[in-house]
């Protein structure tokens, strides 16, 4: 009862938003949160980390996080020095800023690699996508090179699975799925999807009814990169007899759709851990519920057993073998189309 009471209090809005109740051991204290406008933090007096010097030294004395709802406004604010720091700047805006000599005198620009990846989630519950050959076909319709070169302007690298290449248990033997329209067509045909009526869209009889290969691609509105990924997929898919409808959803609606599994394809991203990866949150069947993160319906008894064993294994050599087996299972099932790991696009005022 006491622990339940503590949990309810700890997770309540009061402990997330009210001054005096938001506490921690970091260098700043919470001052104010105006929803949709800003969050203010002040540097603590007599903070323990100041005595250590070096990387733990905290500055400046005050931080204001401004909520800016579109990048056009944010870039204007940067140029006007109304913002001191911005990260995740849109690639095209970032290139323009790099070419702006006046801006470069005021700001330092960085492109550090991110420990994250962008992917397309495929709804395995959808009868159109239940066959792994169809999911493999869709993967062959994604041109990662074009995405990275034309949408990210080279500021990213392709990924082939859920484990970052910097990890010692990354399986470099898993093959990249090449962009190949003809291979996609062949896989669709093998799975029984062909254009039988000449309308340009592959179809198949499913449970006695004719079903066409029409898929919705959902992304969070305002994210131009994800929108354009959908447009590129739409153009490529059409050549293979797959009709893709690109659909924007406001962020909260987008999340709710993925929770309810109300999607065919969605574009998402995961931030990865610098420590040992724990696949359970995303890939275990116990996470396959509305509040869980296994939103593509991946997994079975074999993969669950492997994940459970992996989490309990202390021997590094054995654990690395299990990680590689896990990556192989994911690759064979194709629940995601893994796209790229982005570089962050960061501007920091030169006075810092």
Sequence positions of predicted segments:
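Extracytoplasmic
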Residues: 23-25, 36, 58-60, 80, ...
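Ligand/substrate-recognition segments at binding pockets and active sites
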Residues: 35, 70, 77, 91-92, ...
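Ligand-site clamp/hinge motif
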Residues: 13-20, 47-96, 234-235, 243-245, ...
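Detector for C-terminal structural segments
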Residues: 34-39, 43, 118, 141-175, ...
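Gly/Pro-rich hinge or "lid" segments in bacterial periplasmic/extracellular proteins
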Residues: 1-57, 62, 72-73, 181-192
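Short helix-loop capping/hinge motifs at secondary-structure junctions, enriched
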Residues: 47-50, 125-134, 176, 194, ...
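Extracellular/periplasmic solute-recognition and catalytic clefts
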Residues: 31-42, 66-126, 137, 145, ...
């Amino acid at each position: 009862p006491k622990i339940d009471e503590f949990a309810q209090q700890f997770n309540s809005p009061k402990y997330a938003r009210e001054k005096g109740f938001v506490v921690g051991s970091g260098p700043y204290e919470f001052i104010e949160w105006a929803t949709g406008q800003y969050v203010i933090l002040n540097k603590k007096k007599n903070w323990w980390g100041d005595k250590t010097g070096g990387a733990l030294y905290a500055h400046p004395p005050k931080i204001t996080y401004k909520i800016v709802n579109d990048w056009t406004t944010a870039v204007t604010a940067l140029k006007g020095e109304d913002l001191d720091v911005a990260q995740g700047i849109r690639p095209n805006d970032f290139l323009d800023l790099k070419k702006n000599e006046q801006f470069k005198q005021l700001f330092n620009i960085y492109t550090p690699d991110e420990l994250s990846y962008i992917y397309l989630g495929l709804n395995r519950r959808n009868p159109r996508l239940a066959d792994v050959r169809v999911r493999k076909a869709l993967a062959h319709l994604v041109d990662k090179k074009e995405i990275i070169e034309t949408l990210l302007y080279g500021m990213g690298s392709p990924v082939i699975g859920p484990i970052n290449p910097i990890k010692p248990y990354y399986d470099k033997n898993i093959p990249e799925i090449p962009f190949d329209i003809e291979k996609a067509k062949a896989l669709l045909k093998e799975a029984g999807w062909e254009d039988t009526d000449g309308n340009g869209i592959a179809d198949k009889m499913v449970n006695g009814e004719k079903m066409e290969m029409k898929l919705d691609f959902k992304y969070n509105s305002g994210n131009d990169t994800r929108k354009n990924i959908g447009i590129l997929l739409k153009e490529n898919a059409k050549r293979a007899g797959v009709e893709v409808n690109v659909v924007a959803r406001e962020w909260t609606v987008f999340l709710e759709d993925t929770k309810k599994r109300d999607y065919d394809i969605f574009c998402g991203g995961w931030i990865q851990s610098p420590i040992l990866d724990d696949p359970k949150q995303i890939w275990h069947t116990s996470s396959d519920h509305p509040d869980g993160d296994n939103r593509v319906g991946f997994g079975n008894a074999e993969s669950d057993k492997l994940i459970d064993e992996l989490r309990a294994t202390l021997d590094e050599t054995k654990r690395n073998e299990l990680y590689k087996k896990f990556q192989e299972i994911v690759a064979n099932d194709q629940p995601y189309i893994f796209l790229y790991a982005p570089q962050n696009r960061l501007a920091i005022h030169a006075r810092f």
